[in-house]
A protein has these predicted regions:
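Alpha/beta enzyme core
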Residues: 1-42, 46-66, 70-183, 201-211, ...
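Peripheral terminal and linker regions in Fe-S/redox and tRNA-modifying enzymes
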Residues: 172-392
Length: 392
């Protein structure tokens, strides 16, 4: 997902699950992607979280950013896990040699880093020097971190200068846009619950975007992060910065429960749907156990089970079709959905579809087990190896 350089403004959000719980985290990532998130950030605060990232990254439908505080070793572990990017907080990760070590490793791996300055965790020296968390102090914090990166020849950088005060945030980003040539990640941090948090986030982010400042955004809400992703996407569409003209297809990368060749079905569905230029979100999921739930935010989806496909709209099963008709049925339903609307298609659902899906779900669990991907086995191994390395 390109950021800056003329690329469309992207939407970010952050998971609220424990990253070590990879199953819960990947479920939330799918929900965020379906709601409009282009990039998702996960905390990496302990070795178990890094182990979780190693399982999450290859299964994620969107790029994963590791959020790092205090411990540079966790940044290195996240890089080992294969993350697509890092966020470092210069307010609590302060040692020059550690920062340079992370930047050097990221450079070698071709992984970008966001310098994530936050008014609430500003370095005490800067707070004293500037008489508080001023726009100048926030920008200087980013500049100092950037200088460390430049010393090791690392330049694949994004910058954020967030604050919970909307006026402070706006002025800090205006100054940052005059100071840096790097992409800017916009956000009002700790904005609080909706509706107040939405109002504050929109006031800050929209003001800057309307001025041509900002390359990627995140609403920081005390709420289900799906609300963050949805708000971000809606804001960009309202400002004319993103327009859904065609298909937005998400698909699981398959797992031990998959009843179909997910890749083949996804490719066939994508080709057929793109030819029709339908402006909807469609999900192709490998099994009916978690598929409709993981992709419940998609307009339409299909999940496999017992040699047949289960069509769902916004997570609600509406029809069951033979396996060899899955793609055709998905395309036909997509055309009807665009023509008639979600409510009309939900009203036309087959009465027995949900019961058939539940029967298939139970059969799959009975046949392949609850832990088909051996996640519990992996978690137990992580506990044995890294249980004594808790964050301190």
């Amino acid at each position: 997902m390109p950021v800056g350089g003329g690329a469309p403004v992207s939407v970010q959000s952050m998971t609220t699950t424990k990253t070590a719980d990879s199953e819960a985290t990947i479920t939330q990532i799918y929900a965020l992607a379906a709601a409009g998130a282009d990039i998702v950030r996960c905390t990496c605060n302990e070795p178990a979280a890094a182990e979780g990232l190693a399982r999450i990254v290859p299964r994620s439908p969107v790029p994963i950013i590791a959020d790092i505080h205090f411990h540079h070793e966790m940044a290195l572990a996240a890089l080992e896990a294969g993350v697509h990017g890092l966020r470092l907080n210069p307010g609590n990760l302060r040692k020059e040699h550690e920062i340079k070590q992370v930047a050097s490793e990221a450079k070698d791996r071709g992984v970008p880093i966001r310098i994530g300055v936050n008014a609430g965790s500003l370095h005490p020296d800067l707070y004293k020097r500037f008489g508080g968390a001023t726009p100048e102090a926030l920008v200087e914090s980013a500049r100092m971190e950037l200088a460390y990166f430049e010393d090791v020849g690392f330049g694949d950088v994004k910058i954020s200068v967030k604050a919970s005060s909307v006026p402070l945030m706006i002025e800090a980003y205006r100054l940052a846009s005059e100071t840096f040539d790097h992409p800017l990640h916009l956000g009002v941090t700790e904005a609080g619950p909706p509706p107040g948090g939405l109002i504050k986030g929109t006031a800050g982010i929209a003001t800057l975007l309307a001025e041509g400042i900002g390359d990627t955004i995140r609403y920081s809400l005390t709420a289900d992060p799906v609300e963050e992703a949805r708000a971000g996407r809606q804001l960009l569409e309202a400002l004319g910065l993103r327009e859904r003209k065609g298909l937005d297809l998400i698909a699981c990368p398959s797992c031990g429960r998959a009843e179909i060749d997910v890749i083949a079905v996804a490719k066939a569905a994508q080709q057929a749907l793109e030819e029709r230029k339908l402006p909807i979100q469609v999900a192709v999921m490998g099994c009916v156990v978690n598929g409709p739930g993981e992709a419940r935010e998609a307009d339409l989806g299909i999940a496999a089970g017992r040699r047949r496909g289960h069509l769902f709209i916004k997570g609600t099963i509406v029809r069951v079709v033979p396996e060899d008709e899955m793609v055709d049925a998905l395309v036909a339903e997509a055309e009807r959905l665009v023509a008639e609307g979600i409510d009309a298609r939900l009203a036309a659902a087959d009465a027995g579809a949900a019961a058939e899906a539940e029967a298939d779900r139970r059969d799959l669990l009975a046949g392949k087990g609850v832990d088909a991907n051996a996640s519990e086995e992996r978690i137990e191994l992580i506990r044995k190896k890294y249980g004594n390395h808790a964050e301190g």
